[in-house]
Amino acid sequence: MDEYDKKRRLEHGGSDRSRSSNDNRNSHGSSGNNYRDDRKDDRYYRDDRSHYNNNNNNNNNNNNNNNNNNGNGYRDDRNYSSQNKYQNHHQQSPPQQQQQQQNSSYVPSQPPQQQTQTQQQPHIQAPPPAKPRKSRFDQAPETIPIQAPQQPPMISNQPIFKQQPMYQQPMYQQKQQQPQPPIFQQQQKQQQPPIFQHHQPPPIYQQPPVYQQQQQQQQPVFQQQQQQRVATEAIQFQQTPQQLAIEQERLKQERENEKKIEQANLEEEMKKRREKVEQWRKQKLEQELKASGSSNSGSTSSPPTTTTTTTKTTAATTTATTSPLTIPSQQQQTATTSPIKKKWSLEEEEETAQPLVNTNIEQKEIKLPPTANIPAAAATTTSATINTTTIKQSIEEDDDIDPLDAYMENLNKEANLNLKKSKTSQMIDDDEKLEEESEGEDDGKDKTIKKGKKEMLHTDHTSIKYAEFQKNFYIEVPVLANMTETEVLDFRSELGVKITGKDCPKPIQSWAQAGLTEKVHLLLKKFQYEKPTSIQAQTIPAIMNGRDLIGIARTGSGKTLAFLLPMFRHILAQPKSAPGEGMIALIMSPTRELALQIHVECKKFSKVLGLRTACVYGGASISEQIAELKRGADIVVCTPGRMIDILCANNRRITNLRRVTFLVLDEADRMFDMGFGPQINCIVDSIRPDRQTIMFSATFPPKVENVAKKILNKPLEIIAGGRSIVSSDIEQFVEVRPTETRFRRLIELLSIWYHKGQILIFTNRQETTDNLYRQLSNSQYQCLSLHGSKDQTDRDETISDFKNKVKTILIATPLASRGLDIKDLNLVVNFDCPDHLEDYVHRVGRTGRAGNRGTAYTFITPDEERFSSSIIKALEQSGSKVPDELRKLNDTYEKKRKEGKDVLLAPTGFTGRGHKFDAAEEDKKNIERKQQRKAYGIEEEEEEEDEDKEKAEKEKLAAASAEKEKQLLSEKEKLDPATTNTIVIPGVDGTIITPSSLLQTDPSVPVGQQAINQIFGISQVTSSEEAIKKLQLAAQLGMKGNIQKLNNQITPLNQTHFIEELEINDYSQQARWKVTHKDALLEITNFTNTTITTKGTFFPPNKIPAPGERKLYLYIEGPSDASVKNAKSDIKKILDEVQSTHQSTGKYSVF
């Protein structure tokens, strides 16, 4: 701020700015912004503008007519910059200044009290050139005059508040003031505006009396407020930051003290009212006692059969009649009928306590029993007891209507209501809490609850009358109707569509032929869906026609939109669902991430169409999901487990499935494979039978398809591009490399692809995911990790960050292989090789979506050779080149299998029974099969026919061994002519026993072994290789029981022991340990007098024993057949008991 600005501010410290500013409007067209830093100090001048302008309207009228910009009064003297002002007033000569001052209307405003002082001041010298502005509080030059702010003049005889200085004058201003130049005094005297003259406006501009009276009434209050505000600002301006902090603390303490005082006053008020209530109760009790005493005296003098009736008396009455009172009927009704009492409140209570003199006390009629047969003393005692009872009842009634208790009872009711609401919101906890509650001592109770879910969800459709609904909305356009069958077949072959089923509609060529609404067409144009894809062109007409459908298409082909668009048309044709009625469309998905993705895609259209959607999945807050369902939802996207929880919660009062007419199963093959089968059937059975059911997936094995078709009604199967085929837009690379080199190769790929887009890395295990995340983070790569052990919040944030490109690398388990749609995902790396074809197709299908190009790398180690056949099949079906190393790896594996070596079998993929991820799950399945066979009385037969490959291998080995046995037997027949009398053993093909062979025995060989040798044609000169093959044949054919029976039949001839075998290889680890421990078997051996020996080797379920080896079994020997069988049955009981105890159950045991 320069010197002239400070001088102008000090000159106007006590003047009326509004008057001088109106004159300045004539010469200055606009108000500048050069002096905005002065506003904080002078803002208290703004509020009194109306006061001066109203009283001086006549003086300012002419000046306002020529005003170009209606600025505030005090701002108009800021139009010139400090440099222009300095040049106009100081750098020019005095004549030039005078001429310029006369030509312009600019006159510095100054109060009249200061005019005389200004005229007497001498000249001042011209100040030096203006310096650059530094700060608001920079030191000013010494030549600036100092004038204390003075009180403005009284205008229209109205009091004006006394202006106080904004801040104290600094020390540098307390110097000798220099006189002003004479020329400056002269021009001030000549150009003094008439606004400062003390005169009243002309009568024509006189304000109305009423307005003046109102203004005079409002002015003192306004001035007082202004004075307080100015004083506060002046104090704050003078204080330092430390003082301001102290002042704030003081104000805070004052506010706290005020609150304490208010609280103390409130407590004192409540105390007074409580005392009043207690006093009122005491007085009422005294009056009741008096009234009861009078009634008691009356009852003692009355006849035995007389009814004593008490009337309403006042507290002022001191005497009561002792004779019976006769009251008319109307008066009796009035006396016996209690008046309606108004609810008491604290607000209606008066401040001062008043004696309850005229308070009416109601007394009830008391009927005394007849006292003819009762002594006088007894009668007196009876009447006294009745009176006491009456008093107690009256006291209890008074307690019930106690005012303070009534008030507190209302508060308790409100608190209980809020508590009930909070309990309702937390009625059911998350899935994790349900699992924790199911552990420990409540296992039995929780199993009962879970078992009851099936019964709770069971619906008798015959007893429910469902409303009719429309399925068929499709109207074929003339263009499609005129197409011939040949043209339709050509168009379908062009789309790559194959159809199974009857009466399938013709495929559409554009969105206009689909029969969609106008809003949907606009949304499709907005989201840039130009034309239908192959799967959309054929499935949309079929779904709009009301048919059940199985849709199979490649990843990224638009399957989600294929069922969403017909679903919207289906819902809009039905009445809107009211709160509590349930949803109309239900979409189920196997993973939470896919459910969220479908929900987001659905909301793009539902918001415009006016439909309500809800997403129900595990891991999230169940209270929010319940609230959404109670408000009403037309579309619900869910996972099966959480949906069952909500359907069964609160006795099925949250929602129901009665209005569901459109059911969608996305990734349906995975739904029936991941153990969701019982849950899916449980939900589907609760939906009306005439629903429309849609299934979509990129892979659909035939076995799963057979299971899925059970819930469909005459479905159409539409395959676009093939079944379990990788898209041709994806470039696939498979590298055979050791485990140690995989990470180094991954770093090389990241260095190439890191800046090209987003990257997704798949692993098979959660531990591998965490380790790889740690290694990449140490290598300075920003990445994310995703697997099932993470919280749902972390999983949602991970997917969101990856889609929003916060970080461009995601390491995930196969959890992310289903339905995850990332637009800019350019690279997929299978760090761990997929274990079956369908998993490989879904992993690789995360890239190359919606017509974009993608790249996929797969690492396979020599130890994972069993997976090579699935990858080769995927490469051949998609038309990609198969590396030579991969073919060599597969050939080596097939060669080992043919030779019968110890190799691991590759999983067969989705079989409809649950994917076999590890040996533990396979053990569980085998145990269940064994228990089923035992329940049907089948113990020693082969496995079920579902295990086709294993059975085929066994049959091949058996056929080869049988041919060799026949050749050996034919040779022996030629050598031994005594074959007339032969014994054919049932159950063993091609085995005969001749009498001569039984007589040819070796005393060094046990009798049982000799019999076995005779059965299988094994002589002492037989080679060990042939003997091994024959024993292997017997083991594979499952004839161990027949051999044991034969031993038991032959051995008694020589008085030897009996033998039994019990295979325990397929039981759980706990069961195997139990029956092989000496302590557990000691009791059995002592009781049955047998010997039990563990033999064989443990083999995992997916391994076949090599020739000459057997699975783990128990060898039981005993003196009699009964003892051996008893020992075997006891061991089986132990195995079954341990197996049932340690059998692992799933999360949802509905069936």
From Swiss-Prot:
Which residue ranges have biased composition labelled Basic and acidic residues?
1-26, 35-51, 915-930, 949-972
Biased composition (Polar residues) is annotated at 81-90
- Catalytic class of the enzyme: hydrolase
The text the record gives for the protein's domains is: The Q motif is unique to and characteristic of the DEAD box family of RNA helicases and controls ATP binding and hydrolysis.
Major subcellular site? nucleus
Binding site residues for ATP: A553, R554, T555, G556, S557, G558, K559, T560
Q: Where is this motif: DEAD box?
A: 666-669
Q: What is this protein called?
A: ATP-dependent RNA helicase ddx46
Location of motif Q motif in this chain is 509-537
What processes does the entry annotate via GO biological process terms?
mRNA splicing, via spliceosome
The gene designation is helB1
PROSITE patterns associated with the record: DEAD_ATP_HELICASE, HELICASE_ATP_BIND_1, HELICASE_CTER, Q_MOTIF
Keyword Hydrolase applies: yes
Q: What does this protein do?
A: Component of the 17S U2 SnRNP complex of the spliceosome, a large ribonucleoprotein complex that removes introns from transcribed pre-mRNAs.
Catalysed transformations (reactions): ATP + H2O = ADP + phosphate + H(+)
